[in-house]
């Protein structure tokens, strides 16, 4: 008598609410929380930082009290948080939330994190404080354009897509080369490293996208002005008073913070700071939408429709109830 093979369990469906800045993700997530026992896992590289509340449009205390939120306020602005850390933390949290009999909802707009979660990681070396300190010292002496020129010699493909003053990415690309001996462009082109941890899940993205980008741009300007009115400049000033923060840290390169830092340094006036902050947010939005449109499996909801929250709620419930293809 032949043995009966064990059936492979079907992967658990995980609803993911993705969208650019100012697309209404928080409203849709809270609407779902009013209907189901969910816990929200943030997919946002800015919300991880403590003491950065206004400029990141962090959910309010009341909103966070109404439904559990995860991966918010988990590290200090002086520290770094990687896509690999996000992947490990999120997979752990999904299991813990399910064990409590609740439903995880992934929500955010950092598409690099989502890609790392669903497609695996590249074999890039981790950050090395000593290498970074060396590169910082060289940049202080020679300037970032000089380091960009050095990068062009060892990794011309990466250098070609970076501006000569893009300190964070130039530093990372040189760091990768110094630690691995290989150009970052070569490592990124290699097959991604995967494991079985994510194979137990089927991630279904519900994408909030604008049918008219001009409407979203208007929202972005209104939101940036609201942040300024709420005390954003004071928030950045408090961070500046710390002796361990500087504008090249990942935290201070978040949209808005870098522009506010330049203003407080006296490099720009208030109007220019506002305009540059809004422009940078619009550019971020453009990149986020480009990432979303590269996901053929996504369920699209028009985020500027009058009933966009209701539409997003319906899409999320269909995903959770298994009423979607795939």
Curated annotation (Swiss-Prot):
Record-linked HAMAP family: IPP_trans
Q: What is this protein called?
A: tRNA dimethylallyltransferase
> Which PANTHER family does the annotation name?
TRNA DIMETHYLALLYLTRANSFERASE
Q: What are the EC numbers?
A: 2.5.1.75
Q: Which GO terms describe its biological process?
A: tRNA modification
Q: List the disulfide bonds.
A: none
The protein's matches in SUPFAM superfamilies, at most eight in alphabetical order, are given as: P-loop containing nucleoside triphosphate hydrolases
Q: Which organism is it from?
A: Burkholderia cenocepacia (strain ATCC BAA-245 / DSM 16553 / LMG 16656 / NCTC 13227 / J2315 / CF5610) (Burkholderia cepacia (strain J2315))
Which enzyme class, named as a word? transferase
Q: Where is this region: Interaction with substrate tRNA?
A: 44-47, 168-172, 253-258, 286-293
Q: What does this protein do?
A: Catalyzes the transfer of a dimethylallyl group onto the adenine at position 37 in tRNAs that read codons beginning with uridine, leading to the formation of N6-(dimethylallyl)adenosine (i(6)A).
- The gene from which this protein is expressed is miaA
Record-annotated residues binding substrate?
21-26
